[in-house]
């Protein structure tokens, strides 16, 4: 029986409060047999957006993440670094395969947009990382 190699992935956005938090939680909850996910921001807000937490809860995911800086994860090794749409503000992490998903930030919108963003992220995880 072959052992599946668990890939380490870092999701990065500017504030580490919405998109990257959604991606981290979905990866670790639904795809933990394949991925170990982390998230960080180039300018973290200091808190996870409550609408992101509520969106995850609607699909049965309890998320207790915290908004953190990319400085807190420097020196860690990742197989993939995924920019969620932060452009030039996303850091370059040496030795990692870089992807840019360009997912719009839902923070100014309501429940429907957060759910759409969550579902879009889940589809990208399946298509690009598994």
PLM features: residue spans?
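Short polar/charged helix/loop
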Residues: 2-130
């Amino acid at each position: 029986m072959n052992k599946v190699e668990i890939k380490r992935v870092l999701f990065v956005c500017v504030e580490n409060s919405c998109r990257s938090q959604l991606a981290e939680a979905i990866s670790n909850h639904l795809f933990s047999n394949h991925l170990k996910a982390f998230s960080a921001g180039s300018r973290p807000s200091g808190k996870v957006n409550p609408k992101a937490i509520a969106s995850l809860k609607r699909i049965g995911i309890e998320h207790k993440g915290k908004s953190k800086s990319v400085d807190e994860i420097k020196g860690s090794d990742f197989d993939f670094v995924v920019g969620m749409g932060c452009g030039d503000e996303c850091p370059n992490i040496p030795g990692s395969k870089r992807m840019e998903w360009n997912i719009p930030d839902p923070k100014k919108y309501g429940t429907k947009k957060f759910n759409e963003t969550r579902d879009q992220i889940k589809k990208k995880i399946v298509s690009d990382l598994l």
